[in-house]
């Protein structure tokens, strides 16, 4: 279970992590600057297992992999959004960051306590006593996430061979 950090529509990668930090390659260092201009308290207050919740087109803008890397390094459980920019979605899956699509994110408020049942495909809003369905991921994407990202998934395929 974790806290919802609520954001709006069209959160672009420059808002997630500013371009001036692209010289940093350590995810833990990047995590210190996530949403720095939009919500300066985020990096200091986010806890392992929390959720970033947003509207439409999350991760739009430039295709930098630093954005999902920085988010993952904060310890969040997942990003929950109505929709994603395609390249952000792919980058997130590739590095093992859970990205969930839910059309009912408007019902989630900042600070709500959430829990996700990945098997049932449901988000439980413990604060409001509500449930919201998530769009199921194809099995091969679930397997990539379970392995921790595309590199680990590829290693597991090689080990199976």
From Swiss-Prot:
GO BP term (any one) = L-leucine biosynthetic process
Molecular-function annotations in GO: 3-isopropylmalate dehydratase activity
Supply the EC number(s).
4.2.1.33
- UniProt entry keywords in alphabetical sequence: Amino-acid biosynthesis, Branched-chain amino acid biosynthesis, Leucine biosynthesis, Lyase
Question: Which Pfam families would you find in this protein's record?
Answer: Aconitase_C (PF00694)
User: Its catalytic activity?
Assistant: (2R,3S)-3-isopropylmalate = (2S)-2-isopropylmalate
Q: Give the pathway.
A: Amino-acid biosynthesis; L-leucine biosynthesis; L-leucine from 3-methyl-2-oxobutanoate: step 2/4
Q: Which domain of life is it from?
A: Archaea
Q: Which family does it belong to?
A: Belongs to the LeuD family. LeuD type 2 subfamily.
**HAMAP family according to UniProt:** LeuD_type2
Q: How does it assemble?
A: Heterodimer of LeuC and LeuD.
Biological function:
Catalyzes the isomerization between 2-isopropylmalate and 3-isopropylmalate, via the formation of 2-isopropylmaleate.
What's the protein here called?
3-isopropylmalate dehydratase small subunit 1
In its UniProt entry, the species of origin is given as: Archaeoglobus fulgidus (strain ATCC 49558 / DSM 4304 / JCM 9628 / NBRC 100126 / VC-16)
